[in-house]
C-alpha cells in the first residue's frame, strides 16, 4: 500500500508536452507527496524548465524567482529540465536561490536527489520507458507517449541537439507495453510525441519505424484514438501519410513544422528539404479525407529578404493550414544562425503581424467548418458549473482549440470519453456543442 507523506509538492511543468511526460515521471517517483498548486504551502517546489528559445528561458527564470520569493522556510526549490541542462555550468551561480539543480538525464532519480539534497547531471538523456511509473495529469482519458528523445537534424536555428543529444528511439515493444498499461487504466486516447517523430527508429537502421508503430498500435486494439505530433519534412514520406490515412485508430492529423516554403530560405535554415518535397507532402495530406493540418513557421531568420517573405505569405494564404504557429526568430547560442546578420526586430514584428492575420482567417474558417454537423470528439472534464470541456478527436490537447459542451441528448450523466457531438455556435474562439451519443 502506498502511504502518503504529510508533505506537499508543487509541480510546475513549463514548455512542451515532451517536458510534461518527464514531469509525470517525476510525479511517479514522488507519489507519496500530496500535490498542491500553492507554492507558498509546498514543502517541495519542483519546476521543470524549458530552454528552447529566449522567451521560454525568460519564463523559466521568472518562474524560479517567483517560487524562491514565495516558498516557505525550509521548503526545497528544485529546477530540472532543459534550462538547467543547457546552462548547467553557470546556472548555479546565476540563480543561487535554487536548492537542487538537475538536467534532462535524471528524472527517475528525483526522489533520491531530494533525500540527499544534492544536484545531479548525468551524461545520458533520460527516455521514459514502460516500467517508469507516471502520474498522468490533466485528463482521465488522454495520455502522451514519448517515442524518442534527441534529434539528428542540423537546423541552423535550433539548439535542442546541443542539450538533448542525438536521436534515441525507444524499442517498439516498450511503447506497446506502455500503451497497454495506460489503456487498462482508462486512457484510450493518446498523442505520440518526440523531437522528430517521423525519424523514429532511424537510429536503429529502420526507415519505416513510425509506420511500424502505427500498424502495431492498430493490431493491438487497446486504443480508441490517437495522433502523432512533430513530423519532420525530410523524414516524412507518402507511405507514412498513407499509413495514417488507413489507420482505424490514428486520426487524419498532420503536424509538420515546415518553418518556411522558399527554397533559398530552407537552405539557409539547413532544413535538408525543398519546396517541392514540402508541397508533395502537404498536397498528399490535403487529399486525405477530413484531414487536419498544423504547421509552424519561423519569421525573420537571418538573411530572410522581402521576396522570400512574400513567397511564404502568399503560400500560407493559398494553402490554408487549419492551425499555424508563428514564431519570431530567436538567436540561440551554439547554433549556426546565432552569428549571422539579423533581420531588424521592427521588420520581424511587421511580418509576424501580417502572417498572424492570414493564420487567424483560416483558423476561423476551420472552426466554422465544424458547425451544424456531427463530429467525433473526446470529452475530457468538467469546465465550471455548466460545461464540459471537449475537443475534436483529430485535435491535439491544449493547442488546437476548445469545445464546450452545453447540452446533451443522453439520459445518463456525461462523463469523460468518446462521443459524437454537434457544434452549433462559434464564439470567442470557442465552439459550443451538444452531445448526441457515445461511441
Curated annotation (Swiss-Prot):
[4Fe-4S] cluster 1 binds at residues 16, 50, 82. CDD domains: Radical_SAM (cd01335). Its cofactor is [4Fe-4S] cluster. Its EC number is 2.8.4.4. It is an enzyme of class 2 (transferase). One of its GO terms (molecular function) is 4 iron, 4 sulfur cluster binding. Keywords: 4Fe-4S, Cytoplasm, Iron, Iron-sulfur, Metal-binding, S-adenosyl-L-methionine, Transferase. The keyword ATP-binding does not apply. It catalyses: L-aspartate(89)-[ribosomal protein uS12]-hydrogen + (sulfur carrier)-SH + AH2 + 2 S-adenosyl-L-methionine = 3-methylsulfanyl-L-aspartate(89)-[ribosomal protein uS12]-hydrogen + (sulfur carrier)-H + 5'-deoxyadenosine + L-methionine + A + S-adenosyl-L-homocysteine + 2 H(+). One of its GO terms (cellular component) is cytosol. Residues 137-368 form the Radical SAM core domain. Residues 7-119 form the MTTase N-terminal domain. [4Fe-4S] cluster 2 binds at residues 151, 155, 158. InterPro entries: Elp3/MiaA/NifB-like_rSAM (IPR006638), Methylthiotransferase (IPR005839), Methylthiotransferase_CS (IPR020612), Methylthiotransferase_N (IPR013848), Methylthiotransferase_N_sf (IPR038135), Ribosomal_uS12_MeSTrfase_RimO (IPR005840), rSAM (IPR007197), rSAM_horseshoe (IPR023404). NCBIfam families: 30S ribosomal protein S12 methylthiotransferase RimO, MiaB/RimO family radical SAM methylthiotransferase. Belongs to the methylthiotransferase family. RimO subfamily. HAMAP family: MTTase_RimO (MF_01865). This is Ribosomal protein uS12 methylthiotransferase RimO. The lineage of its organism: Bacteria, Pseudomonadati, Campylobacterota, Epsilonproteobacteria, Campylobacterales.
